[in-house]
Design a protein with these regions (language model features):
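Repetitive beta-architecture junctions, highlighting loop-to-beta-strand starts
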Residues: 26-28, 41, 75-77, 115-117, ...
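Conserved beta-propeller blade repeats
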Residues: 1-20, 48-68, 89-109, 141-156
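Beta-strand C-termini and the immediately following turn/loop, strongest in propeller blades
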Residues: 12-23, 29-34, 47, 57-60, ...
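Blade-level signature of beta-propeller repeat domains, shared across WD40, Kelch, NHL, RCC1
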Residues: 149-185
Length: 185
């Protein structure tokens, strides 16, 4: 096993994840992904603070890290340089969580506290410039904490929403085993 933690994000040969402890809350850790057969080493603390740091999302090129920072009942999406935190920007205002990068790394999506998904353009030159948050989608209710992602072509949001109006019966899942053998017949 490489390590234990929650909400892994992988890019550019690096792994960033959250760990929860009873004494500190949630903190972010990171490590280099090992080559086959090599010792993975020990995860290092990346973002350790009294606040809860969760939902890490590495940019596709591995130079920026977005995450949710929970402090005294308020959660915001933060963007910082990676691995060294030389610069830091607040992406959301009025509450935000669950950041997800576009495949090209030119936009960051996040959920507001009330549910809508926002998009912020990210321009990287000598510095990082953030655009104005724009409403993208108002999902009825996402099933998981993150519960959405951006399609590989960057043109669509893919999400898992709760089905409403089923009278509380829940959702059934059908598992088809050995379907390929049946298909060949």
């Amino acid at each position: 096993m490489l390590t234990t933690g929650l909400q892994p994000s992988i890019a550019a040969g690096r792994l960033v994840f959250a760990r929860v402890s009873a004494s500190r809350g949630a903190d972010l850790f990171h490590m280099r992904l090992p080559q086959a057969g090599a010792d993975p080493g020990t995860p290092q603390g990346l973002q350790e603070s009294p606040a809860n740091d969760v939902d890490p999302a590495l940019s596709p090129d591995g130079t920026l890290l977005a995450y949710s920072l929970g402090n005294q009942g308020n959660t915001e999406v933060i963007l910082r340089t990676y691995p060294a935190a030389t610069d830091r920007w607040q992406v959301s205002s009025g509450g935000g969580a669950s950041p997800v990068w576009s495949p090209r790394g030119d936009a960051l999506y996040y959920r507001t506290i009330s549910g809508p998904i926002m998009r912020v353009d990210v321009r990287k030159t000598a510095t990082v410039t953030l655009g104005t948050p724009r409403l993208v989608q108002r999902p009825s209710r996402l099933v998981a904490r993150v519960g959405y992602d951006v399609s590989p072509d960057g043109k669509r949001l893919l999400m898992v929403e709760e089905i409403t109006g089923d009278g509380g019966r829940g959702t059934s899942v059908t598992v088809a085993q050995n379907w390929f053998a049946a298909f060949r017949k």
